[in-house]
Amino acid sequence: MLQILYLAQDLADPAVRRRTLTLVAGGARVTLAGFRRGDNPLAAIDGVEPIELGTTADGRFAQRIGAVARACLSLQRQLGHVRKPDVIIARNLEMLAVARRAVAFFGGTVPIVYECLDIHRLMLRKDIVGRMLRAAESQLGKDARLLITSSPAFIEHYFRPLSGIGAPPMLLENKVLEIDGTVERRTASPAKSPPPGAPWKIGWFGALRCRRSLALLAEFSRKMEGRFEIVLRGRPAYSEFDDFDGFVRNEPFMRFEGAYRNPEDLAEIYGEVHFTWAIDFFEEGQNSAWLLPNRLYEGCRHGRIPIAMKGTETARFLSVRSIGLVLEGADVESLATVLGPLTPNCYADAAERISRCNPGSWVFDRTDCEALVRQLATLTLQAPQTVPVVAMAGSSHKEGGFL
C-alpha cells in the first residue's frame, strides 16, 4: 500500500478533505499534516487524524512565512512517529518548503509532488517581490517529480511561461468525488423551473471570497424585484469583506445557509437552486480568469445551469460543450439581459443539454482514484517518469447568452 504524506496549507479547507478521501479511496495510506486557518468540523475525515504544524491566517503572508519556518524547525518532533512515506504531496508554495525539510528528515529519496490549484497574485507581480517569489518557488520545487494543477490555463499562462517548476504537469480537474456504495452517489432532483410566483434561485457555493460577485448578485436580485433569489453556502473569506454577515442580512433576496460537507451534501444543496454562479472576480484577469472552479463541476453534475464570464477558462469550457450561460459584461445589465427573458422552455432546453454530457466530465470515481494512486506509485521508481498533461478540449468560443 502506497504511503503518502500529504502536507496541506489549511486543514480546515474542504478541498483538502476531498483530496485526502480521493487518495484513501485509491488505496493509499495517508498521513495528513499542515496548518490550520480556522475551525471547520465538517472537514474531519474518519480514520485520519491530522498533525497540526501551526496556525496561519488568510491574507497574512508574512505571518505564514514565520509559521512555515517554525514548522520546519520542529518537523522532527512533529513527524518523528510517522512512518517514512513513499511520496510527499505539498499543497501550495509554503508546503514545498516543509516538504523539502521532510525529505531531509526521512531521507533524500522520497519524491515530492507539488499541488498548486491557485496562482496567488503575488506570484504574478512583475516587480522584485514577484521575481523573488517565483525564484523561491523554482528553488523549492526544483526536485519535484510531478506538478498537479486543476486547469489547463494555469499551465498555459503561468507554469510554462513564468514559473521555474520543471516537473511534468498533471491536469487533475476539480471534479465531484463519487465513491461506489456511498451516499455521495445521490443525484439532485431533476432541474425544473420554479412554480408560478416562486423565484428562480442562483446558488453561489464553496469558497466565498469575491466581493464584486456579492455586490453584483445583490444588486441584480434587487433590480429583478424578487424574481431571483441568491443562495450562498460555504466558507466566506471574511478578510475580503467589510461585513459579510451584515451585508447579506440587509439584502431582501439573498441568504447565507452556512457550510456543507463535500461531497456528501451536494445533491441536497444543488437540488434547491436552478443556476450555479461559476464566476470569480477575485484576482480578476489572472487566477480568476484561469481557474475551473469546483462549483462548475458540482452544479453540472446535478444538472444546474452554470453562469460564467466571457473571456475566462470557464467560458471556454462551457463553449466546447455547448452548455451554460455566459455574460458579456460584469454588470447588472448583462446579467439581466441573459436571465431577464428566461422562460421555462428555455431553461428546460439548457438543462437537457447538460444531461447529454458524459457523466465523466463531472465525476471522479473510485476507478479514477485508483488510477491516480497508481500514477503516484510510479514516482517511487528511481528513473523519473513522464506524466503527460491530460488532453485539452478544443478552444473555440461561442460566448454570450445560452450556448
From Swiss-Prot:
The keyword Translocase does not apply. One of its GO terms (biological process) is polysaccharide biosynthetic process. Its EC number is 2.-.-.-. The keyword Transmembrane helix does not apply. This is Succinoglycan biosynthesis protein ExoL. It is found in: Cytoplasm. GO terms for molecular function: glycosyltransferase activity. GO terms for cellular component: cytoplasm. Keywords: Cytoplasm, Exopolysaccharide synthesis, Glycosyltransferase, Plasmid, Transferase. Pathway: Glycan metabolism; exopolysaccharide biosynthesis. Essential for succinoglycan (EPS I) synthesis and nodule infection. Glycosyltransferase needed for the addition of the third sugar (glucose), catalyzes the formation of a beta-1,4 linkage between the second and third sugars.
